[in-house]
Regions:
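Extracytoplasmic "Venus flytrap"/periplasmic binding protein-like
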Residues: 40, 44-111, 120, 149, ...
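Extracytoplasmic/periplasmic solute-binding protein
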Residues: 124-130, 135, 153-202, 208, ...
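Conserved C-terminal helix/tail region of periplasmic/extracytoplasmic solute-binding proteins
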Residues: 1-10, 340-392
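Hinge/lid segment of periplasmic solute-binding proteins
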Residues: 84-136, 146-149, 153-157, 163, ...
């Protein structure tokens, strides 16, 4: 049976799993599905055990735990359960094994293209996708027959159905990573960009980005609640599920919870990609999780076997059924959701992502709370980001 380890007494400076044992740090296993999968892996691999460390719920806290273990130089974990935005940092630091030649052609063809792209750094694959995520525009289809395609459509329909008891559009405006993902979808919809993935060019002070932020600022207090600059995912979901909003920007998990609570159910709700400007394309910000192999593991072949096992279709089907999560395999994605996921885009694949995101969050928040004009905020953010990336 897989050994489940709590954080109390755990040393992150211990070597990666000893012979016959593989260690992995993950989120709390509320449903027990991961424990069951680890038990099955052990049954299929006699003599090989899994030490499962249940970490804190917060993603950044687990990233810090992995980073601390790697920086100690002895790599406390053999397998890394990695957020898509960790890949560039971890790969650039030399913490992950190159898996390019280990993945099969069949698996490469089955995984969603954006999830594979987000698992790649400088042309090499360092993570095998498992669970995907993407931003969606949810709408009340009992009020709106067809989802809006453009920003003008969104504004018009939100105004049409807004009332004293119902806001037009709710989204995540607090100073945190969720604000960055919302901003990116609106920037992409305007034809703009944050940081060019190939050249590392910072494009925050271009007109498309300024127009995107101005759009967000103008929403607050008009079609979006005055408290938007304090909202995360759950605040906005609560407003929408109670029937107090026409449109909601949020992640895939909202769909899984739609019939479990609140007054609004799936029969009254539809979803679509975020809207775009005329002549531009919509895109959803990619999220999601996958598995990587530590370069410090004592048994890379065994660690790879665990990664391969956890990302098999049958394993991911169990996670889908018990957690309500969406598999990163195209063959397992619901047909109505696939078109949205095929338009998902990763965030900039740079090792300095966390620092760049912090800069952007601070200045986006300054604009949303009217402490700085959008053009000024993005000019300052662009300057700080260029200094961080050492680019002109």
């Amino acid at each position: 049976m897989a050994l489940v380890v709590g954080l109390v007494g755990l040393s992150l400076h211990q070597p990666a799993g000893e012979a016959g044992s593989l260690s992995i740090l993950m989120e709390p296993d509320a449903t027990g599905v991961w424990r069951d999968l680890f038990d099955r892996f052990e049954q299929q691999n006699p003599g090989l055990g899994v030490q499962f460390v249940e970490g804190p719920p917060a993603t950044n806290a687990r990233e810090d735990m992995y980073s601390t273990a790697f920086l100690a130089g002895r790599g406390g974990f053999d397998v890394v359960y990695a957020d898509v935005v960790w890949v560039p940092k971890f790969a650039a630091a030399g913490w992950l094994m190159d898996l390019t030649d280990r993945i099969s052609v069949e698996d490469r063809q089955d995984f969603l293209p954006a999830d594979l792209q987000g698992s790649t750094y400088r042309g090499r694959l360092y993570r095998i996708p498992a669970l995907t995520d993407a931003g969606l525009l949810y709408y009340r289809k009992d009020l709106v027959a067809q989802p809006p395609a453009t920003f003008a459509d969104l504004i018009a329909r939100a105004k049409e159905h807004q009332s004293p008891d119902r806001w037009g559009f709710v989204w995540q405006g607090k100073q945190y990573e969720g604000l960055v993902t919302c901003f990116l979808e609106i920037v992409w919809g305007h034809g703009g960009e944050w940081i060019d993935a190939e050249t590392r060019e910072v494009r925050l002070d271009e007109p498309a980005a300024v127009d995107a932020l101005q759009f967000m600022v103008d929403l607050i207090g008009d079609l979006s609640p005055p408290g938007t600059s304090t909202y995360t995912e759950e605040e906005t979901r609560t407003i929408f599920r109670s029937g107090r909003a026409v449109f909601l920007r949020n992640w895939l998990y909202v769909w899984g919870l739609m019939d479990q609570d609140g007054t609004i159910g799936r029969s009254q709700v539809g979803f679509a990609p975020m809207v775009h400007a005329p002549g531009k394309d919509s895109a959803s910000t990619l999220g999601g999780w996958g598995f990587a192999v530590s370069r410090l593991t004592k048994d890379p072949d065994a660690a790879w076997r665990l990664v391969e096992f956890l990302t098999r279709p049958e394993s991911l089907a169990q996670v889908r059924d018990r957690m309500g999560r969406v598999s990163a395999r195209q063959s397992q994605v619901p047909a109505d959701l696939l078109p949205v996921l095929l338009k998902a885009r990763p965030r900039p694949p740079i090792p300095e992502y966390a620092q760049a995101s912090d800069i952007l969050q601070r200045w986006l928040s300054a604009a949303l709370t009217r402490r700085a004009a959008p053009a000024e905020a993005l000019s300052r953010a662009a300057s700080e980001t260029r200094l961080l990336l050492n680019v002109d």
